[in-house]
Regions:
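Bacterial N-terminal signal peptides that target proteins for export
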Residues: 1-12
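Mature, structured domains of secreted/extracytosolic soluble proteins
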Residues: 6, 24-187
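Bacterial N-terminal signal peptides
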Residues: 10-21
């Protein structure tokens, strides 16, 4: 009986070890996959940079076109880290009619660059870092102010406009994106 119990114990131990070794890689893979966030119907992979991810979001085609027109692809593909408040296509659609078409013209590159770099803060700031009343200095040089209300995060621009963070903490290899529902305007 003792010999049979020993064999049974050894078999159970082997089964546990084998099942653990098979499950561990799957769990690690699932954990890496769970770090991805869906934005605009596309997975945003933490192993890719801001530009590599943004080009796949159907909600950010206007932003991507503007980044290309402003010549900021190289910068936002760089090492960073950056915190980007990324306006959706709907956010750009809230601007007066014709604004985006005017901004992407070569003669307006400086203005477009000013607006886009106003959405970028040096360093990686997670949602938990965006505390109520916190002032952020953008790459453009002006300030943004964080407001929290009802569990939501709002970013207030220099003109008093408020943009709500709709998808926080979209991690990138060179920073983090927070999707916002309005375009932020510098002073």
């Amino acid at each position: 009986m003792s010999k049979g119990l020993g064999i049974l114990s050894a078999a159970v131990l082997c089964a546990v070890m084998v099942s653990t070794s098979l499950v561990a890689p799957v769990s690690a893979k699932m954990m890496r996959h769970s770090d991805t966030v869906m934005v605009g119907g596309a997975a945003m992979y933490p192993s890719k940079n801001i530009v590599q991810n943004a080009v796949h979001s159907k909600d950010h085609t206007t932003l991507v076109a503007a980044v290309k027109a402003a010549g900021l692809v190289g910068t936002l593909s760089g090492p960073g880290p950056f915190t980007v408040f990324a306006p959706t296509n709907e956010a750009f659609n809230k601007l007066p009619k014709g604004t985006v078409a005017t901004l992407v013209k070569p003669e307006n590159k400086a203005t477009l660059t000013k607006i886009l770099t106003y959405h970028v803060v040096p360093g990686k700031l997670e949602a938990s870092d965006l505390t109520d009343g916190k002032t952020l200095t953008t790459v453009e040089g002006d300030q943004l102010t964080v407001r929290r209300s009802g569990g939501r995060i709002y970013i207030v621009d220099a003109k008093g406009g408020m943009s709500r963070v709709t998808i926080p903490n979209v991690n990138q290899s060179n920073g983090v994106i927070h999707v916002v529902n309005s375009v932020l305007m510098p002073g």
